[in-house]
């Protein structure tokens, strides 16, 4: 009986697993959460592997089987599907990595596993651990720039007081007078523009009666109506410059 039990004893796992025992999934679990499992083959022989789980509907494993060459590493991605987190589930799900030394000729992987003897199989079990981020992790994930103003204020001292932009009575009175003056100039220009417009209409009437002079009349109309926008721009620039000068000084 002892010899029979010894013959049925399984070999120790040839692969080196990283992580060796726990697959940790960090929440929140409202989206797919992925963790990686590295399988290293330190031997001088090819090793076939496959990954199994007790909850196949909850996980997607890529690749879930394959062959690892001597001295090579294969990274297996284990993707946990979204679900409503329940702390009581944290230790229920398990994974198993099953391995076997590859035969000389590998033509059908399914046949390799079907024909494998129990004492040729090697396996390792891992449990799933669900972790929810705590408040400290949330603070560490915040952008560093959000914490900079606090440190900067301590090093640089109190912030300088903003410049006052209020105007005293004398400056206000000057601004009002300047506004009235500019309004008067605007009224004058408006009157001149009306006069020029009337003159243009008169010239157009003359042009209709005298066709040879139509070109010069139209040209004159364009010339007499153009000064107003230029003058308005100049006055607006003076007005804005005056205000900016008052606020800055």
From Swiss-Prot:
Report biased composition (Basic and acidic residues) as residue ranges: 135-144
Any single GO molecular-function term of the entry would be: protein-membrane adaptor activity
- Residues with PTM Phosphoserine: 166, 214, 216, 219
Residue span(s) of domain MSP: 14-131
Q: Which residues, renumbered to this chain, carry the PTM N-acetylalanine?
A: 2
N6-acetyllysine is found on 125
Protein purpose: Endoplasmic reticulum (ER)-anchored protein that mediates the formation of contact sites between the ER and endosomes via interaction with FFAT motif-containing proteins such as STARD3 or WDR44. STARD3-VAPA interaction enables cholesterol transfer from the ER to endosomes. Via interaction with WDR44 participates in neosynthesized protein export. In addition, recruited to the plasma membrane through OSBPL3 binding. The OSBPL3-VAPA complex stimulates RRAS signaling which in turn attenuates integrin beta-1 (ITGB1) activation at the cell surface. With OSBPL3, may regulate ER morphology.
The record's note on its domains = The MSP domain binds the FFAT motif of many proteins.
Kindly provide the name given to this protein in its UniProt entry.
Vesicle-associated membrane protein-associated protein A
